[in-house]
């Protein structure tokens, strides 16, 4: 991921090209992308910029800053820039906000505005969803994945020949304010699922130290598991 990094050296760009052509996945962002990464992103700059909204789920989120208008040269549109919160029936004239381009065995997702800077400053859930949709469009192979609320974090570790999937629930209930930061209660995150690539079928899987409900199966090199609850911290032990 190269977020809003302008004037990257040509030597580094050539390494990026080789990385993607060999099967790598890349996300670049910023209004400069069409001009500075055009060949890699499959676009060229058009005249003018656009401001407005980005489609996110069944709604839209306001995007701050300008999005560069582009001409598609092999890339396809992932998200358009909307003039308001509704997607028009005829979207032929919409400005691409994000695009996807296949390069060799890999692919490049480009976001043509300052979305990472916007998210850093505001943390709007809609922007997080757009970024997640762009990342998912890359279809990166070999990744472990969670289907869980955004506040559930997973970290994988190896110890004594076992794989340990740590889960942390970062949610909080009750009111928060600029002068009251106490967390009085962490609500259960509820049921969620994960997928972890594993070459061989595990002998055993269990949750520890909290033995919550667990259903798992292995197929075609992927371990899939449904976990019934997560309070604050728990571990899926894979043997």
Which residue ranges define each predicted feature?
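A conserved amphipathic helix/loop scaffold
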Residues: 3-239
């Amino acid at each position: 991921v190269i977020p809003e990094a302008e004037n990257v050296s040509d030597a580094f760009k050539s390494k990026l090209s080789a990385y993607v052509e060999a099967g790598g996945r890349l996300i670049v962002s910023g209004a400069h992308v069409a001009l500075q990464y055009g060949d890699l992103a499959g676009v060229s700059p058009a005249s003018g910029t656009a401001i407005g909204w980005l489609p996110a789920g069944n709604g839209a989120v306001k995007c701050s800053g300008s999005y560069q208008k582009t001409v598609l040269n092999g890339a396809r549109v992932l998200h358009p820039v909307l003039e308001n919160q509704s997607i028009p029936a005829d979207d032929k004239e919409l400005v691409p906000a994000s695009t996807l381009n296949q390069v060799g065995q890999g692919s490049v997702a480009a976001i043509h505005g300052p979305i990472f800077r916007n998210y850093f400053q505001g943390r709007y859930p809609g922007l997080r969803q757009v970024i997640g949709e762009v990342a998912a469009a890359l279809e990166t192979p070999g990744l472990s994945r969670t289907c869980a609320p955004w506040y559930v974090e997973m970290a994988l570790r190896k110890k004594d020949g076992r794989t340990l999937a740590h889960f942390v629930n970062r949610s909080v209930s009750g009111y928060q304010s600029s002068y009251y930061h106490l967390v009085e209660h962490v609500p259960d995150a509820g049921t969620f699922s994960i997928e972890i690539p594993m070459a061989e079928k595990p002998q055993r899987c269990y949750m520890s130290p909290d033995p919550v409900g667990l259903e798992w199966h292995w197929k075609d090199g992927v371990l899939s598991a449904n976990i019934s609850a997560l309070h604050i911290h728990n571990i899926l032990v894979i043997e």
